[in-house]
């Protein structure tokens, strides 16, 4: 709910800048979502493996699963961040983005896409808190991040007049704060690292991928379908109003 609220707030605030800014951010987020699917494979599988081992009284193995998920998502996140930051313009041109949206979408994709590793790490630490029963603490990180996002959006848009760059910067800062909060809470509240149970890392990783891949595949199919829809809509006009209308509708629906 709070992630959806964040998107709605960004859209409403950007609408005060221009409709094309809304369309540019909506288009960029669609393609960021495709890359983020990779993180879901590990995080969803990691949650299942951690839950199984906590239920079986093996918190040490649950900690191992967290560590494996953290390393895998961190490496994948850094790689995707570099790709999106360096090749943002080429990616958007390859998907036939409307010329009127290109500059704003490229700016957003460079900044937010370049910080995709945050999207890779936040679910790892949030899930770690939730499976050990600290659901409220995970929520605190999300709420604080959203509040900071709203405040920074207001400052960057209406005081500094940074437009799309301001919204992108606010998004990255708020996610960084969210990550710091959930990571710190996990380190303070959960002592699973001290438990003696251990398992072969290769076996745990195989379990994570085996469970996570099917659950992420459904989301992957949906997101890929959305990218084709957005591409077709961009090809239908040069001013990007079709994808702008879609961005508004997606936030309202």
Residue locations for each model-derived region?
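Alpha-helical transmembrane segments of multi-pass membrane transporters/permeases
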Residues: 73, 128-154, 165, 169-172
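Small-residue-rich hydrophobic transmembrane alpha-helices
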Residues: 11, 22-82, 119-138, 230, ...
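Cytoplasmic helix-loop-helix junction between adjacent transmembrane helices
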Residues: 97-105, 109, 116-143
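Transmembrane helical elements of multi-pass membrane transporters/channels
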Residues: 1-10, 111, 145, 174-178, ...
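Interfacial/gating helices of multi-pass transporter permease domains
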Residues: 14-33, 100-104, 164-165, 207-211, ...
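Short alpha-helical transmembrane segments in multi-pass integral membrane proteins
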Residues: 50-117, 159-213
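Helix-loop interface residues and adjacent transmembrane-helix termini in multi-pass membrane transporters
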Residues: 5-8, 16-19, 53-56, 131-132, ...
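Hydrophobic transmembrane alpha-helices of multi-pass small-molecule transporters
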Residues: 34-37, 149-153, 179-183
